[in-house]
């Protein structure tokens, strides 16, 4: 292959739109020091501004924990109904993103098992891709999440972030449902 560059041709300035952001697969990876080093390098050397990843609500992020998730307590009456909502692991991830000089591009996914209508998982890391069993409960969960972000990072900071409802709901490996199901999920999330 030969490449010819006409150095006398008219040029146009680059708009650097590619520097807007980069994807990083799974949120939990941002707990790793080596991943943070790579993301900081991407920011410092390439100018990326936002970082987007999947799975901030995956079970390994411990956002919703039920007493029944712990084997010794499964026999306790109503153990599935006793739960805690906690965004500490998500906060650690976002703290790391901000420490790298970037801002989060928040993908509101996937479904915590405690809120899920089923057990269908997507690719690799057991992300639950089902819809919530209760849209009202999901909406309440999202409201708690947004309030947590506002308390921790402040309104001005959070307003500088981008938010996305789910990841590629048109692909069966990421969302179990039809287009109308996604529209209902979106409406319940964006309230």
Where in the sequence are the language-model features?
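Non-catalytic accessory regions flanking glycosidase/transglycosidase catalytic cores in CAZymes
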Residues: 1-162, 180-191
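Aromatic- and kink-enriched transmembrane "portal" helix at the membrane-lumen/periplasm boundary
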Residues: 169-173
């Amino acid at each position: 292959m030969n490449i010819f560059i006409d150095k006398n041709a008219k040029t146009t300035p680059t708009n650097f739109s590619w520097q807007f952001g980069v994807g990083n697969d799974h949120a939990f990876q941002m707990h790793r020091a080596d991943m943070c080093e790579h993301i900081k390098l991407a920011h410092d050397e390439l100018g990326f501004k936002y970082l987007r990843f999947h799975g901030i609500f995956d079970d390994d992020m411990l956002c919703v924990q039920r007493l029944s998730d712990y084997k010794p307590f499964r026999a306790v009456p109503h153990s599935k109904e006793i739960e805690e909502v906690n965004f500490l692991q998500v906060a650690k991830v976002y703290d790391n993103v901000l420490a790298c000089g970037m801002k989060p591009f928040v993908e509101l996914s996937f479904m915590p098992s405690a809120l899920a209508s089923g057990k269908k998982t997507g690719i690799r890391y057991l992300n639950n891709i089902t819809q919530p069993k209760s849209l009202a409960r999901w909406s309440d969960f999202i409201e708690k999440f947004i309030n947590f972000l506002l308390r921790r990072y402040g309104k001005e900071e959070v307003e500088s972030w981008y938010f996305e409802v789910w990841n590629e709901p048109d692909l069966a490996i990421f969302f179990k449902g039809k287009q109308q199901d996604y529209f209902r999920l979106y409406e319940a999330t964006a309230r």
